[in-house]
């Protein structure tokens, strides 16, 4: 039947194929289900429903093709045998290939625009694939169109997830994770510390001493067990000796009255004689075990004594080595301190001093520029008004204010009146009355220099002697001590020579080294 169909397909004309481009040949319909099954096995899961639908569509013409072909063949053979030509009115105006397809099938391909079923690969013509038509709507449980929507939703960032990250529960879970991690680290910290201490012991040679300690502990247990064994063996030896002595006494008693023996006495003598032989062997074995136990105990005690002496010797050697290392470490620490002091004293301090001086000079320069600008503006305004004494009044006021401030400080600190007069005279003598208004900045600088010179030349007054009988003196002394203690932590600037700084730094380094060495030596001796 397949050969007949193939022969019939070869008779198709090119005009018939051009008129029916969407209709495949019958042989392709017969081969198509096999290829569809093969492609169903190798296709993805999401195309299985589509392939099944195409297979069902492809099988629909076959269900109508075979019966009609059989009926047509039978009618043709009957008409040829009876030589009855068909009526002209009943003859169809279309060809056999067009007649074998049902109207419903043509309506299915034409109206619904079903996707064209592709032929097998070996029969597929090399043409550009047409655009995919719109698929027929499927039931709700077989809709594959929802899968891309889910994928799009998965790919796009969800604002709900962003909001969930800021919820208290999410933050609490993160905090719990950090707490678990911290607890895990704390749990393993003890092991890490033990490993670090073991490495330090290996480097310093203390691991051998630890091994000696463990050996001494084992030997002590062995000596204790040996002593217990000697004690039990000696007790057993004494028991066997006492049993043999009692049996020998009874034998001696029986031998003393040998003439009056009865049969029972004879049996008793025989039993005692046999028992004496057994007791003699037991005494010999007990004596041997006692000697062996005493020998083992003495050996264990000797090993214990030698191990203790060896441990003491090794600890002395180790302590001497650690002491030497600590000495060299102390000297190294002192060298580092001295090096740091030299670096800070000759490298950092000059740089800091230059920086402070530069900043101070800049500020002084700015202050002088401002004062000069102010003096010039004052002179200009005085010239415009008609009085040229504005700048002189300003400079005199500045000098008077400085003198008054110096007097107040002298009164507070308890300076004598001659010192104040000397400072005032120095300032007043060094500050001349200027006649012109063109150099106010220079005059202010000279006045400041005169004030610095006067402050350096202030005589120091000796404090009055302390009165031990007056309570007020004690109160003043306590207040002064409290003020001095507070002043130690104040930000007051003081001037000191480099020699004093060097001495203080060296004293601090030496004191720290001595204290560290003493603490380390005390710890080593205690261990």
From Swiss-Prot:
Residues 109-171 are annotated as: Disordered. Residues 117-128 have a biased composition (Pro residues). The chain crosses the membrane at residues 328-348, 503-523. Residues 277-308 form a coiled coil. The keyword Isomerase does not apply. Residues 129-144, 151-171 have a biased composition (Basic and acidic residues). Residues 524-527 are mitochondrial matrix. Residues 349-502 are mitochondrial intermembrane. It is a multi-pass membrane protein. It is found in: Mitochondrion inner membrane. GO terms for biological process: inner mitochondrial membrane organization. InterPro entries: MDM33_fungi. GO terms for cellular component: mitochondrial inner membrane. Pfam families: She9_MDM33. It comes from the Eukaryota. Required for the maintenance of the structure of the mitochondrial inner membrane. Involved in mitochondrial morphology. Causes growth arrest when highly overexpressed. Homooligomer. This is Sensitive to high expression protein 9 homolog, mitochondrial. The gene is she9.
């Amino acid at each position: 039947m397949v050969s007949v169909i193939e022969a019939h397909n070869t008779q198709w004309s090119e005009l018939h194929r051009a008129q029916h481009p969407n209709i495949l040949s019958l042989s392709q319909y017969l081969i198509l289900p096999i290829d569809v099954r093969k492609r169903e096995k190798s296709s993805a899961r999401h195309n299985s429903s589509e392939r099944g639908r195409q297979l069902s569509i492809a099988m629909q013409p076959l269900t109508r093709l075979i019966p009609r072909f059989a009926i047509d063949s039978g009618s043709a053979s009957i008409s040829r045998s009876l030589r009855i030509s068909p009526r002209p009115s009943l003859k169809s105006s279309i060809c056999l290939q067009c007649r074998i397809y049902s109207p419903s099938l043509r309506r299915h391909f034409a109206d619904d625009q079903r996707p064209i079923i592709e032929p097998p690969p070996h029969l597929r013509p090399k043409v550009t694939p047409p655009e995919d038509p719109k698929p027929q709507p499927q039931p709700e449980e077989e809709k594959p169109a929802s899968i891309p929507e889910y994928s799009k939703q998965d790919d796009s960032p969800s604002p709900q997830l962003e909001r969930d990250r800021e919820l208290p529960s999410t933050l609490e879970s993160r905090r719990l994770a950090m707490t678990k991690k911290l607890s895990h680290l704390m749990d393993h910290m003890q092991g890490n510390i033990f490993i670090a201490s073991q490495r330090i012991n290996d480097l310093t040679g203390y691991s051998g001493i630890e091994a000696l300690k463990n050996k001494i502990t084992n030997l002590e247990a062995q000596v204790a067990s040996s002593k217990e064994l000697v004690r039990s063996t000696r007790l057993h030896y004494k028991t066997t000796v006492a049993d043999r002595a009692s049996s020998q006494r009874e034998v001696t008693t029986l031998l003393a009255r040998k003439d009056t023996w009865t049969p029972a006495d004879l049996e008793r003598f025989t039993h005692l004689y046999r028992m004496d032989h057994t007791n003699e062997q037991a005494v010999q074995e007990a004596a041997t075990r006692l000697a062996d136990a005493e020998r083992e105990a003495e050996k264990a005690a000797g090993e214990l004594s030698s191990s203790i002496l060896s441990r003491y010797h090794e600890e002395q050697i180790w302590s001497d080595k650690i002491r030497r290392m600590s000495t060299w470490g102390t000297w190294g620490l002192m060298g580092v301190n001295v090096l740091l002091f030299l670096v800070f004293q000759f490298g950092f301090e000059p740089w800091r001093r230059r920086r402070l001086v530069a900043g101070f000079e800049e500020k002084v320069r700015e202050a002088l520029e401002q004062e000069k600008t102010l003096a010039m503006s004052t002179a200009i305004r005085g010239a415009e008004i008609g009085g040229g004494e504005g700048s002189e009044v300003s400079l005199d006021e500045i000098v008077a204010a400085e003198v008054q401030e110096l007097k107040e400080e002298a009164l507070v600190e308890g300076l004598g009146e001659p010192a104040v007069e000397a400072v005032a005279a120095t300032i007043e003598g060094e500050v001349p009355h200027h006649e012109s208004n063109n150099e106010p900045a220079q005059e202010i600088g000279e006045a400041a220099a005169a004030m610095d010179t006067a402050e350096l030349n202030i005589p120091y007054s000796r404090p009055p002697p302390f009165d031990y009988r007056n309570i007020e003196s004690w109160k003043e002394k306590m207040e002064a001590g409290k003020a001095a203690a507070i002043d130690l932590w104040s930000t007051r600037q003081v001037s000191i020579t480099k020699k004093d700084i060097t001495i203080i730094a060296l004293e601090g380094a030496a004191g720290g080294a001595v204290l560290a060495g003493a603490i380390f030596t005390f710890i080593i001796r205690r261990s």
